[in-house]
Amino acid sequence: MRSDMIKKGFDKAPHRSLLKATGLKDEDFDKPFIAICNSFIEIIPGHKHLNEFGKLVKEAVRAAGMVPFEFNTIGVDDGIAMGHIGMRYSLPSREIIADSVETVVNAHWFDGMICIPNCDKITPGMMMAALRINIPTVFVSGGPMAAGKTSKGEVVDLSSVFEGVGAYQSGKISEEELKDIEDHGCPSCGSCSGMFTANSMNCLCEVLGLALPGNGSILAIDPRREELIKQAAEKLKILIERDIKPRDIVTEEAIDDAFALDMAMGGSTNTVLHTLALAQEAGLDYDMNRIDAVSRRVPHLCKVSPASNWHMEDIDRAGGISAILKEMSRKEGVLHLDRITATGQTLRENIAEAEIKDKEVIHSLENPHSEEGGLRILKGNLAKDGAVIKSGATEVKRFEGPCVIFNSQDEALAGIMLGKVKKGDVVVIRYEGPRGGPGMPEMLAPTSAIAGMGLGAEVALLTDGRFSGASRGISVGHISPEAAAGGMIALLEQGDIVCIDVEERLLEVRVSDEELEKRKKEWKRPEPKVKTGWLGRYAQMVTSANTGAVLKIPHFD
C-alpha cells in the first residue's frame, strides 16, 4: 500500500506513535488510509451542511474496512464575493485549494481519497488536485439547493435576486417585491439551484467519471445523497483494489464527453476555463478548437435556469444526468461509452437503465432546442485565441453596435446604473482578465443589472473577465489574449463598431488592420492593480484563459 511509507518497518515507530495519538490501533496499520477532503465552511450555503456529510463519509469508509482521515480546504462564495474586491480572490482560490489538497495528501501518503466539494472553485480545485496526485479517488458533492418561491408563488433563485436589483433600480419592482425575492431566492443549503457554475461542474464531474451517477442532480436535502456517500466508500475500495486512478479515468475522450454534456445542457461558461485546467493537470493537449468541434456535433437538449424556469430538481425528476447521456448516446459519435469510470464500470453500463421521464425538461434528439450546443467558441480579430458565449442563454444570434468602454467592473456597474448604456450598445469591460483583474472576476452584477433593466436582448457585453453561470444575455467572456497582455480588447476605443455573430462564431471590431497596428504601437501596459500578497504573486504567474488560467512554473537558468 502507498501508506506503508508512513506505517511499516521498525524505522516508522515514531510515525506509528504519532498516528496512535490520533486514535489508531495496531490493526489499523494493515488497512488502507483514506483522505477525506472536505470543504465545510459556514459562510457558503452550498457547504454549510458538509460537516455532517464528512461524518457520514467517515462512517462509510470505516464500514468498508478502511481508515478515514478528514481535513478541510478553504472556499469562496462567489455570490457573496460578487461586485467588490472579494471577487478577485475567487478564481485564485482554485489554485490554493488544489495546492492544499496536494500538500496534505502527498505529505501523508494516503492510499485513496474521497472529495466532498460543491461550489464554484472548490470542485475544480479538488479535481485538479486529484489528477495531480493521481491516487484512487471518488467525488461526492454536497448537492444542489431547491429553487425558492416568493409569497406570490413565483419560482426564484439567486439569479432572480441579482436581476431584482436592476429591476428595482429601474423602477420595475418595489422595494417590498425585491425583499420578497431576496427572502426566498436561496431557501436551503446546497449549491445554487440553476445551471450555474457549481452545478455545471458537479454534473461534469459525474460525466468525467470521477463521481457516481446522481452526483450532479440529487438535491442536498434528498436522503439519496446519503446513499451516494455509502456507495462512494464502497466504490473507492474497488478502485484501490484495481488500482484505477484519476488519470486512467480523465482521458481526452472523457473530457470530450464532459463538454458534450455541457453543450447539451448549456452549462456555465466557466466550465471551459476549469476543464481546460483539468486537461493541463492530466498532461493532455486539449484546446478550444476541440471544444468548438464538440459544440458543433452536440444538440442542445435542455435549458436550465437562467436560460429557463427549470432548475436542477427538475433535471433530477426528469431522469438526471444519466437520462441526458442516454439520449445523447443515440446519436453516433457524440459519446465515448466504453471508457472506465469511478463505479468500476463503463459509462455505457452506468447509463444503461436510464430514461427520460419528462420530455418538457429534457428534450429528445428529435426535438432539440438547437442542433448545436449551448456554448460556443468565438474567434476573430478581437479574440485571436478565443472567447466563450453561452449561446443557449440568448435568442439573439447576431449583434452589432458601438462600444461603450469601461476599464473595470466597478466602473461599468456605476455607468450602467447611471444610464450611460443604452439600447444597441456593446458594453466592453476590460483589464479584468486573469492577470489584469487580477483573478478574472465574474461579471454577474453588470449582466444582471442590464437584464433587470429590460435591456438583456438589446445590449451586448464583452469582457476578458468571466461570467457567472447565472449570467444570461449577449455576454461574451474569456476574451484571449486579455487586455493586460496587450490583447486587441485593450485597443478598442469608444464608439468602435463590434460585431458578434454566434452562428458564424465570429467576434470582430470594424477597424482596419492598419489602425489596430497603429493603436498597438501607442498602447502602454497599465501598472498592476495589485503588487503584493497572494494576488500580486498570482498576477505574475497566471496564464491566459484559453489555457485554463493555470499558474506557470517559473524556469530558472
Swiss-Prot record:
Cellular component per GO, a single term: cytosol
Gene Ontology process terms (BP): isoleucine biosynthetic process; L-valine biosynthetic process
Top-rank lineage group of the source organism: Bacteria
Cofactor: [2Fe-2S] cluster; Mg(2+)
Top-level enzyme category: lyase
Assigned EC number: 4.2.1.9
GO MF terms, alphabetically ordered: 2 iron, 2 sulfur cluster binding; dihydroxy-acid dehydratase activity; hydro-lyase activity; magnesium ion binding
UniProt cross-references to Gene3D superfamilies, sorted A to Z: IlvD/EDD C-terminal domain-like
Alphabetically ordered keywords of this record: 2Fe-2S, Amino-acid biosynthesis, Branched-chain amino acid biosynthesis, Iron, Iron-sulfur, Lyase, Magnesium, Metal-binding
Catalytic residues (positions): 468 (proton acceptor)
Positions of modified residues (N6-carboxylysine): 121
Pfam families noted in UniProt: ILV_EDD_C, ILVD_EDD_N
Reaction(s) this enzyme catalyzes, per UniProt: (2R)-2,3-dihydroxy-3-methylbutanoate = 3-methyl-2-oxobutanoate + H2O; (2R,3R)-2,3-dihydroxy-3-methylpentanoate = (S)-3-methyl-2-oxopentanoate + H2O
Cofactor note: Binds 1 [2Fe-2S] cluster per subunit. This cluster acts as a Lewis acid cofactor.
Residues at which Mg(2+) binds: 78, 120-121, 442
Residues that hold [2Fe-2S] cluster according to the record: 119, 192
PROSITE patterns, sorted: ILVD_EDD_1 (PS00886), ILVD_EDD_2 (PS00887)
InterPro entries xrefs: Dihydro-acid_dehy_C (IPR042096), DihydroxyA_deHydtase (IPR004404), DiOHA_6PGluconate_deHydtase_CS (IPR020558), ILV_EDD_C (IPR056740), ILV_EDD_N (IPR000581), IlvD/EDD_N (IPR037237)
Pathway assigned in UniProt: Amino-acid biosynthesis; L-isoleucine biosynthesis; L-isoleucine from 2-oxobutanoate: step 3/4; Amino-acid biosynthesis; L-valine biosynthesis; L-valine from pyruvate: step 3/4
Similarity-based family: Belongs to the IlvD/Edd family.
NCBIfam families cross-referenced by the UniProt entry: ilvD, PRK00911.1
Function statement: Functions in the biosynthesis of branched-chain amino acids. Catalyzes the dehydration of (2R,3R)-2,3-dihydroxy-3-methylpentanoate (2,3-dihydroxy-3-methylvalerate) into 2-oxo-3-methylpentanoate (2-oxo-3-methylvalerate) and of (2R)-2,3-dihydroxy-3-methylbutanoate (2,3-dihydroxyisovalerate) into 2-oxo-3-methylbutanoate (2-oxoisovalerate), the penultimate precursor to L-isoleucine and L-valine, respectively.
Subunit-level organization: Homodimer.
Name of the protein described by the UniProt record: Dihydroxy-acid dehydratase
Species assigned in the record: Bacillus cereus (strain ATCC 14579 / DSM 31 / CCUG 7414 / JCM 2152 / NBRC 15305 / NCIMB 9373 / NCTC 2599 / NRRL B-3711)
